[in-house]
Amino acid sequence: MNDIAHDARPFVTDIKTLRARARQHIERGAVTAGYSADRDTVVKLLNEALATELVCVLRYKRHFFMAQGINAQSVAAEFQEHAAAEQVHADQIAGRIVQLNGEPDFSPDGLLTRSHAEYAEGDSLVDMIKEDLVAERIAIDSYREMIDYLGNRDPTSRRLMEDILAVEEAHADDLVQLLHDIDA
């Protein structure tokens, strides 16, 4: 006898049922009957992530332009690279919100209250790096919580946030290395 346990349920719903369900609520696009997450909650969480990314873009841009001192050129280049990556993340998140039939909230009103990260300017190059590192660490923790919440209910949003999380972790490592390089 085969050691693999067999499930009595069919692997997929019969094709006739799949086709019929696909025609229902066609205006919802990618949000099908099989979508099991609370769409409104997911859109709210994604808008918070969007605000976080936008605040990070703004902070990194300021730090890029304000970086001064002996190590400023290499650190500013890192700030610029991170700002560009955060902008890509913002665009990806906004695209997913639209795919879920939501509206991405780009309004400056309340941007800081929606964002998990703060907008801190920093007085010196080291302060700027530390503020960016704190913001990355906040994003890492909040995105991990979002990923846990999404679980299998919204695997597409979960994978998006997992990909973004990996970049945020790399950014945190970059910033720690910059601090070590400056101290050396």
Q: Across the structure, where does each feature detected by a protein language model lie?
A:
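Iron-associated oxidoreductase/ferritin-like identity signal
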Residues: M1-A184
